[in-house]
Amino acid sequence: MCLGGENYLELTELIFIVVAVVVSLFVGGFIGWLIRKSAAEKLIGSAEEEAKRVIDNAQGAAEAKRREAVIAAKEEVMHIRNEVEKESRERRNEIQRMERRVIQKEESLDRKMESLERKEDNLHRKEEEVDQLKEVLTQTVAKEKQELERVSGLSTEEAKQILLQSVEEEVRYESAIMIKDIETKAKEEAEKRAKNIISLAIQRCAADHVAESTVSVVALPSDEMKGRIIGREGRNIRTLETLTGIDLIIDDTPEAVILSGFDPIRREVARVALEKLIADGRIHPARIEEMVEKSQKEVDQRIREEGEQATFETGVHGLHPEIIRLLGRLKFRTSYGQNVLKHSMEVSHLAGLMAAELGVDVQLAKRAGLLHDLGKAVDHDTEGTHVQIGVDLAKKYKESWEVIHAIEAHHGDVEAKTIEAVLVAAADAVSAARPGARRETLESYIKRLQKLEEIADTYDGVEKSYAIQAGREIRIIVRPDKIDDVLAPKVAREISKRIEDELEYPGQIKVVVIRETRAVDYAK
């Protein structure tokens, strides 16, 4: 029982302690809560005061900002209002100015309308007056026409024909004057430019020509050689003539034998062969045949060398070998006494120089100029003109169309379509017409002069004509009562056309029409 009582006391003390501890904790917590509550109330109070102070400050600043914003807004509104009022005033002023201008224009239009109305009224009145005058004039003209027909004895149609004829003559006269002026200006300009180009080309081209004949002279060491050349019963001379086709003329000319023939190549072969025979001294038919054969080969070689030299001097390259050989043959060909190869080379140089002045193809012009008389190398052996033969040869050896065209156009057989063809024709005429370049037989020369004068004398109004300057100029004296100064150029042009159509001549012929009026009286 004692043990149980002690446990009970311990339990009671333990409970008491626990209760005391719990009560202490509760009391301590309550006191702490009171302390924290008091501190919190103090903190809240100070925070409220601070918040109030901040709010008061913020409200003051906001009020100040608001007042500033209100002031700024009022100022902006005032500024905008001033701008709007200023713009409005300007617009009103502009509208007022426009209104004044519109009013002025309306007033001006009104005045113009009134003026137009007055003019229209005047026009109507004048139209009425004109109609009345027309009617009166028509009646007057009809009366005058009847009176004129009665007085003149001519009908209206007859008078009209006379008037038309008079007007036609007047128009023809005026047109002739205009044509004369235009032709004069065009000819002056064309002649000036052509003379300039041709003179420059001629000045830069120096060429010499030797007028060759149909005979060659071979010098002999002595007159005894003539008998050896003739041979027994003339067999040597017959053999040489048979082999070469050349006539040997042995006359009284001392120490010389003449070779005559129209083929220059055969004549050259005969000359070379005869010189070899004379130098060798052995002259008999077999030796003659041998020397003629050697001479033929030498002349053929010389022909080729002459052709090559011509191409070298003119600067024309790429020719077919056969064309080069044909060019060499031209060395022994003459036309009116002018060496054809020298003439072709001169034409090549002139055409090239004129082409350079005009800025066209110089090489093409020189090539066409060199080959323009190629047909003369074989025209003795082939039918046809030298122009057609030259065209055929150029086609055969694949020359260009431009070169072929220049060959066929250089004598005017066809119309020149390229400037190179024109230049070749001009160069050919310049080379042929140069004083001393060519010569004609006396008979053909006289016939040409007579034909020139005959053509001029057949023209109506021509009194007399004279061919001068070796047939390169014809002066025609006309009757002043038949041909006036205006028609004189027409006469010259028509006679020039007839000369071109009916005559063949190298170069050009100047046609001069002379009209002279003389007034003669006698003092008594």
Curated annotation (Swiss-Prot):
PANTHER family found in the cross-reference section: RIBONUCLEASE Y
Protein role: Endoribonuclease that initiates mRNA decay.
Record protein name field: Ribonuclease Y
Family stated for the protein in its record: Belongs to the RNase Y family.
Residue ranges of domain HD in the record: 340-433
Superkingdom: Bacteria
Transmembrane region(s): 15-35
One Gene Ontology molecular-function label: RNA binding
Name of the top EC class for this enzyme: hydrolase
InterPro entries per the UniProt record, alphabetical: HD/PDEase_dom, HD_domain, HDIG_dom, KH_dom, KH_dom_type_1, KH_dom_type_1_sf, Ribonuclease_Y, RNase_Y_N
UniProtKB keywords: Cell membrane, Endonuclease, Hydrolase, Membrane, Nuclease, RNA-binding, Transmembrane, Transmembrane helix
Database matches in Gene3D superfamilies: Hypothetical protein af1432, K Homology domain, type 1
GO biological process, one term: mRNA catabolic process
Organism: Desulfitobacterium hafniense (strain Y51)
Lipid bilayer topology: Single-pass membrane protein
Main location: membrane
Enzyme Commission designation: 3.1.-.-
A cellular component annotation (GO) from this entry: plasma membrane
Domain KH: 214-277
Name of the gene: rny
Compartment(s): Cell membrane
